[in-house]
Amino acid sequence: MTSATSPIILKWDPKSLEIRTLTVERLLEPLVTQVTTLVNTSNKGPSGKKKGRSKKAHVLAASVEQATQNFLEKGEQIAKESQDLKEELVAAVEDVRKQGETMRIASSEFADDPCSSVKRGTMVRAARALLSAVTRLLILADMADVMRLLSHLKIVEEALEAVKNATNEQDLANRFKEFGKEMVKLNYVAARRQQELKDPHCRDEMAAARGALKKNATMLYTASQAFLRHPDVAATRANRDYVFKQVQEAIAGISNAAQATSPTDEAKGHTGIGELAAALNEFDNKIILDPMTFSEARFRPSLEERLESIISGAALMADSSCTRDDRRERIVAECNAVRQALQDLLSEYMNNTGRKEKGDPLNIAIDKMTKKTRDLRRQLRKAVMDHISDSFLETNVPLLVLIEAAKSGNEKEVKEYAQVFREHANKLVEVANLACSISNNEEGVKLVRMAATQIDSLCPQVINAALTLAARPQSKVAQDNMDVFKDQWEKQVRVLTEAVDDITSVDDFLSVSENHILEDVNKCVIALQEGDVDTLDRTAGAIRGRAARVIHIINAEMENYEAGVYTEKVLEATKLLSETVMPRFAEQVEVAIEALSANVPQPFEENEFIDASRLVYDGVRDIRKAVLMIRTPEELEDDSDFEQEDYDVRSRTSVQTEDDQLIAGQSARAIMAQLPQEEKAKIAEQVEIFHQEKSKLDAEVAKWDDSGNDIIVLAKQMCMIMMEMTDFTRGKGPLKNTSDVINAAKKIAEAGSRMDKLARAVADQCPDSACKQDLLAYLQRIALYCHQLNICSKVKAEVQNLGGELIVSGLDSATSLIQAAKNLMNAVVLTVKASYVASTKYQKVYGTAAVNSPVVSWKMKAPEKKPLVKREKPEEFQTRVRRGSQKKHISPVQALSEFKAMDSF
């Protein structure tokens, strides 16, 4: 980097012909094309055709001569205007003129005799010399542009030095104003240079340096002002010196990028994918061997050594403080499984040694090996996501606590909170590096490491700003300085958070967030029952933070997709969580804390709090289900612990899972599938009876167009949910656990309540007392059977340990659920029929004109479209004569009773 007093030094060899900008490349390309075309004329050697002048060659020679003349004119103009490199530019122009003349003569002679290899060789040498001369001229012109940029940089450096040497605040304001003007000019010139740079790395470096200059310039004034106002506070000098150093490094970065001499990412340690990811990738590649050349002595030690290195890295992650115990156990189990898979694979290679083709057992062993490494990767990703979910939660709290302590002027307290803040910053950096270690996203890893480096260097300066404020709590300048560093810290944390999110999977994030929210919900319930207000408040805050992060990340993720049914479903789930579920949860937390904090503990509805907490978990789970809707089977396989992982971490005190008795992490649905065959047969009989009742409902609702008829819509919804519940009793369907079945029962109850409201409105308008009483009676049945279904929804398989053998049984609870669903289905069928009859009675007595706003619209469903002309089968081409059918008059009531749709919904 140049100092304010040193001359401008160009880190660029003028003799080098390396093209560094797109402009030089664009200007040179036409001449290269013309010369190449000319050189390649008659490149096939002597021919039997009559010798003579080549019209094409003469035309090309003339175009080369004209292009050379254009370069000469532009070069002379640049040499006149240039303050730097004037002599070099003039010499380059003369060289182009000389080589151009040589090329003109050589090309003319070649055009006259294009079959002469001697003349062709002379022209080729002249062409090379001309291209070199023109390239050198363009590169020198490019250097002149860089020199102008470096001149701007020197002016900015001098202005920066002036700001640093300001003696009072008025002097600082004046000098900073001049610095700002020069900054604007420099930014404009640097932006132009950035667009011209050919090397993407240099463009990135230029952009980063410009960003750093702009970012630190905002802190330069307040840090300098704080130093001038409070020179006796050591922290102010540290702040000022830090900002000056950052600005100087940014200026040096612009200089290096402009000259394409930036330090490489390798030198900065920012390059490459994660170390653990790279090791796993390499291991996966190394296990594919040729049995013909396999040697145990050669390959076994190498593969085992590579695997142990990977396992060492995995062990470090497993032993980290934020890694959950269950996750640690899974990582250890996967490491052991990978070890065993490698030994099995090596054994198969030994069995196949010398064979040309791999046998099936060997291919199976290779597939098993890759599957085990994939499983290990997944557990490592989830472990990292555990860290991210915990560390990147409420990232501003340590900073706000530090600032509040500083405002109070308590320096001792500030130093204590500064240590907490430093540990928080170190944790962010550590977790960010962990995320990098298992990521294959090279560009993303680079951004995360750069952002983490910025966090690491900024942390001490935030503490210095807090120490300044603590020493001078009444000083507005100290407060402004603190605000600037606070804003900068928050921006940098956001940058780091977004960078980390970019290199991690949204599926992993949702899976882990769901588990963590479940843990926190259970902690909240325990704290509530124990009257622990602090734990309740803190854990509820964590739940709100986790939910807010889920909403933010998923909304951002959906911006990557085109709007459609998928995004609508996902955004609908996030909207429900943010606008309905979380406000209710916050309200219940406030009520609980107020009740527990009162001098005399006040009674409150504990179940309301539990329900509100459960809805948060359900909301996040629904978002995850919606996001996974478009995943391929392979992607879902990679998230194969979707079913197991979400439940086996729950405690025995969990309100969510007190009815979910699990066997080795299996879901309740999976356990239902393990019922004895006798019980399965009896359940199948009950399901068959249920299906008969369902077919009646299908036939009834299929008659009607459901647009404008919410009774039909609700009947369909209830039928669909009841089908899922009966499928659960057979170990099938989308419902996995008792909690899912309970949720389904709640949805049916909600639908039943809405149907009750609509049907009662129909009954109120019905003048026929008999029809009205029938309809109300059926509605009472719906309410009764909904309640029964809610009770029976706590269906679970009972697991007994008899003589060391696990015995699974669940016939009674399953048949009760199916019977309740069948009864409810029958009540819904009768309600639909009675609602229609009640509606027709009203219209029959009063006429349709009297109905201003009917409750629901009863319109027959249009039949399926059929071709107007029936296509004959090939074998039925003969003309047929049939007797015309006799027309019959059919009453509307008879038509309605006979109408039956072919397809159930």
Swiss-Prot record:
Membrane-topology descriptor: Peripheral membrane protein
Parts of the chain that traverse the membrane: none
Signal peptide: none
Function: May function as a linker between cadherin adhesion receptors and the cytoskeleton to regulate cell-cell adhesion and differentiation in the nervous system. Required for proper regulation of cortical neuronal migration and neurite growth. It acts as a negative regulator of Arp2/3 complex activity and Arp2/3-mediated actin polymerization. It thereby suppresses excessive actin branching which would impair neurite growth and stability. Regulates morphological plasticity of synapses and cerebellar and hippocampal lamination during development. Functions in the control of startle modulation.
SUPFAM superfamilies in the cross-refs: alpha-catenin/vinculin-like (SSF47220)
Record Pfam families: Vinculin (PF01044)
Keywords: Cell adhesion, Cell junction, Cell membrane, Cell projection, Cytoplasm, Cytoskeleton, Developmental protein, Differentiation, Membrane, Nucleus, Phosphoprotein
UniProt-annotated stretches for the region Disordered: 869-891
Name this protein carries in UniProt: Catenin alpha-2
Extent of Basic and acidic residues compositional bias: 869-879
Sequence positions bearing Phosphoserine: S640, S651, S853, S891
Molecular function GO terms recorded: actin filament binding; beta-catenin binding; cadherin binding; structural molecule activity
Chain positions with Phosphothreonine modification: T632
PROSITE patterns in UniProt: VINCULIN_1
The family this protein is said to belong to: Belongs to the vinculin/alpha-catenin family.
UniProt biased composition (Basic residues): 880-890
